[in-house]
UniProtKB/Swiss-Prot annotation:
The active site is at 155 (proton donor/acceptor), 159 (proton donor). One of its GO terms (biological process) is lysine biosynthetic process via diaminopimelate. This is 4-hydroxy-tetrahydrodipicolinate reductase. Gene3D superfamilies: Dihydrodipicolinate Reductase, domain 2, NAD(P)-binding Rossmann-like Domain. Its main location: cytoplasm. Belongs to the DapB family. The keyword Phosphoprotein does not apply. Its EC number is 1.17.1.8. Pathway: Amino-acid biosynthesis; L-lysine biosynthesis via DAP pathway; (S)-tetrahydrodipicolinate from L-aspartate: step 4/4. It holds the Pfam family DapB_N. NADP(+) binds at residue 35. It comes from Pseudomonas putida (strain W619).
Length: 267
C-alpha cells in the first residue's frame, strides 16, 4: 500500500483528497496535517471528511508524522509548500504539488528539489484538463498566427490567485507551440481605449464568483470562424483523484520533476 499524507487536511481540498485516497485501491491515508492554530488538530481525519473514523489523527507538524508516509500531497499555499518541500527533500519523501501561485524563482526551487526526490507538480491534476492541454498544443500549431487567442477562466469567490494556474499553464502551452514567450505576449484584462488588438498577444480574462469549481475556455478566433476548447469541473474530486493517481505513479520512480503529462503518458 502506498502510504499517503495530506497537507491542509482540514480544508475543502484536503477533505476531498482524504476521501479520494480512501477510495483508491493501493493507497491509504497514513498522515494528515493542518496549520498549528487549527482547532481541529487531534480530530480523526476520516471524520473530517465525513467518512467515519479511520484512526488517523490530524497533526499540526509534518515532523511529527515523518515516519508515517511515503508521499505528501500538498494543495496549500506557496509559502507552506516550499517549507514542506525542504522537509521532504531532507527526508527523502516524494511529493505531489497542486499548489498554484508560485513565482518563477520559486518554481526553480521545485526543479532543484527534483534532483533529489521524485515530484509531480501540476497546475491542474484533472485528466480532462491535461487532455485539453494536448488539444491546445495541436490547435495552436495548426492555426498559427491566423487567429486571436483569448483565455477565459472562472473560479469560486474564495480563490486567491488570478489568473488561475491552469489558465497560465494553458497560455504557456499555446505560447510555446507558437514560439512565443508568454511573459512578453500576455495581456491581463483590458480597460479604456486599448486600440486595435495585437494578434501576437494572448489575452486573459478572470471571473471570481459563487462556488464555481473551475471553468476554462481557450478561444481561437479567426475571420469567419472560431474554435473554443473548454473544460468545466463540477467537483474537486476530479483533481483529487488525479493527485492520488500521480502518487501511485511515483512509486519506484527516480528523482525528477514530473507533471501530469508524464503520469498520463501524453508526451
Amino acid at each position: 500500500m502506498r502510504r499517503i499524507a495530506v497537507m491542509g487536511a482540514a480544508g475543502r481540498m484536503g477533505k476531498t483528497l482524504i476521501e479520494a485516497v480512501q477510495q483508491t485501491q493501493g493507497a491509504g491515508l497514513t498522515a494528515a496535517i493542518d496549520r498549528p492554530d487549527s482547532s481541529l488538530v487531534g480530530a480523526d481525519a476520516g471524520e473530517l471528511a465525513a467518512l467515519g473514523r479511520i484512526g488517523v489523527l490530524l497533526s499540526d507538524d509534518l515532523a511529527k508524522v515523518a515516519d508515517d508516509f511515503d508521499v505528501l500531497i500538498d494543495f496549500t499555499h506557496p509559502s507552506v509548500t516550499l517549507k514542506n518541500l525542504a522537509f521532504c527533500r531532507k527526508h527523502g519523501k516524494a511529493m505531489i504539488i497542486g499548489t498554484t501561485g508560485f513565482t518563477s524563482e520559486e518554481k526553480q526551487l521545485l526543479a532543484e528539489a527534483g534532483k533529489d526526490i521524485p515530484i509531480v507538480f501540476a497546475a491542474n491534476f484533472s485528466v480532462g484538463v491535461n487532455l485539453s492541454l494536448k488539444l491546445l498544443d495541436m490547435a495552436a500549431r495548426v492555426l498559427g498566427d491566423d487567429v486571436d487567442i483569448e483565455i477565459i477562466e472562472a473560479h469560486h469567490r474564495h480563490k486567491v490567485d488570478a489568473p488561475s494556474g491552469t489558465a497560465l499553464r494553458m497560455g504557456e502551452v499555446v505560447a510555446n507551440a507558437l514560439g512565443r514567450d508568454l511573459q512578453e505576449v500576455a495581456v491581463y484584462g483590458r480597460e479604456g481605449q486599448t486600440g486595435a488588438r495585437d494578434r501576437q498577444t494572448i489575452g486573459f480574462a478572470t471571473v471570481r464568483a459563487g462556488d464555481v469549481v473551475g471553468d476554462h475556455t481557450v478561444l481561437f478566433a479567426a475571420e469567419g470562424e472560431r474554435l473554443e476548447i473548454t473544460h468545466k469541473a463540477s467537483s474537486r474530486m476530479t483533481f483529487a483523484k488525479g493527485a492520488v493517481r500521480a502518487a501511485l505513479w511515483l512509486d519506484g520512480r527516480e528523482a525528477g520533476l514530473y507533471d501530469m503529462q508524464d503520469v498520463l503518458e501524453l508526451r
